[in-house]
């Protein structure tokens, strides 16, 4: 078998399967597997535990100005990920599919950095440190993990056990049926990245980015058809949207909703004026947060 075809099969047997699994669990929360219906569902159910937030702020006031900058970076990366907007632009958007994976990762990473900066003023010197802190101190905390992060983003692998136990939280039978595949994904991630502690999906997203950067990302242009491109596009957009909505809910809790909306208005003004880009997907999320009046500090 030629090396390029080995890479072709390798992708289909790993990242294609894992993204399908993650996306299936996410979309199982609603009857209509669309971003809009997921946003409505999550904004009604996700929240940041106020006691957890007070405890963290008592220990460390964080760096709010830096958190705001990271949040705007996350939005900028998400705009790049979604450009050009619309299902009719799928082929154009995914022409350089591996670069979209990189933009997806930096959307997630900037979102992680945002939340860490709300509760941690110490210097974070590497991506490894940030990902490990996020998983061990935020996602693994029983008080918030499935309150703020929807399945499967709430799951971590500790040893060989998936936490929280899928049977202990409110998810569909379809979602539970994909949890064994999720365990396989996280075990493979832990082995690939040589992780010593708990593994979360944010670690997997780093592995996915490394595949795009260092393996054979160029094979998308040569070998994969519309179905594979569509699956990748759907996965990246749905996952980043759900993750960032959780980060925005946490930002509304730490900053206050009006402060968050003001930051977004300034960001939007710059994006439209300088980039001629209308971030309609962000408008939708901000409108929902404002409409539902997400509880704040």
Locations of regions flagged by a protein language model:
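Terminal alpha-helical segments
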Residues: 1-297
